From Swiss-Prot:
It is found in: Cytoplasm. Gene3D superfamilies: GroES chaperonin. This is Co-chaperonin GroES. Transmembrane segments: none annotated. One of its GO terms (cellular component) is cytoplasm. InterPro entries: Chaperonin_GroES, Chaperonin_GroES_sf, Chaprnonin_Cpn10_CS, GroES-like_sf. One of its GO terms (molecular function) is metal ion binding. Pfam families: Cpn10 (PF00166). Belongs to the GroES chaperonin family.
Length: 96
């Protein structure tokens, strides 16, 4: 686990590796495979600051989420590649 605390309405996500094979069973080289667009939330900020105070985030640590291919900023912390993005960049939470 990385020691990182995002600010405000930002979350830190660890990408979940997706299968690098096509439906036909062809193995894709790393350069041809798209970066995964799902991951696990590993840290959340305190919330979005609004005129009415602070609004807590809807996602929590451990949630599996979907996000756009180009969402967030990639950072390297302790040798681990992580994504930092605003909660609004998260498209959905995977349940079940």
């Amino acid at each position: 686990m990385s020691n990182i605390r995002p600010l405000h309405d930002r979350v830190v996500i660890r990408r979940v590796e997706e299968e690098t094979k096509t439906a036909g069973g062809i193995l894709l080289p790393g350069s041809a495979a798209e970066k995964p667009s799902q991951g696990e939330v590993i840290a959340v900020g305190n919330g979005q600051i609004t005129d009415n105070g602070v609004r807590a985030l809807d996602v929590k640590v451990g949630d599996k989420v979907l996000f756009g291919t180009y969402a967030g900023t990639t950072v390297k912390v302790n040798g681990e590649e992580l994504l930092i993005m605003k909660e609004s960049d998260i498209l959905a939470v995977l349940e079940g």
